[in-house]
């Protein structure tokens, strides 16, 4: 899957936080965002993974504007595990990654061997 961000700008309470960010991340690539506190890294990511929908510019997943992707389909394509979480839960890293498979299953369906293999492959990449 390819991610392309074109001229992304985000303002919060009319204050510009991010201005003119463009980037491309190819299928299978890993990218790090570096910068000082308050420079807009988290704001950029929140726009990319739909936590903040108020932005200008374009965010494309495999060439498709994210605004045109249905929520369920977006959940199948993109999963986020935040660094900080206010909810105390007792899950292993593997169990949290496996939760990302939920949009690919039916309501009462359990994970399959294929899901387990996908999780193993994902964890092997990091």
Language-model regions: role of each:
Residues 68, 84-98, 103-109:
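Conserved catalytic motifs of ABC-family nucleotide-binding domains
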């Amino acid at each position: 899957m390819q991610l392309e961000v074109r001229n992304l700008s985000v303002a919060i309470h009319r204050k510009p936080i991010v201005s003119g960010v463009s980037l491309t991340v190819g299928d299978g690539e890993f990218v790090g965002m570096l910068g000082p506190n308050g420079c807009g890294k988290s704001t950029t990511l929140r726009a990319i993974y739909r936590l903040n929908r108020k932005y200008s510019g374009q965010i494309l997943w495999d060439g498709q504007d994210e605004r045109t992707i249905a929520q369920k389909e977006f959940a199948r394509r993109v999963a986020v595990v935040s660094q900080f979480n206010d909810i105390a839960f007792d899950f292993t890293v593997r169990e949290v990654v496996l939760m990302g498979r939920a949009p690919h299953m039916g309501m009462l369906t359990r994970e399959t061997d294929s899901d387990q293999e996908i999780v193993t492959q994902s964890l092997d990449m990091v």
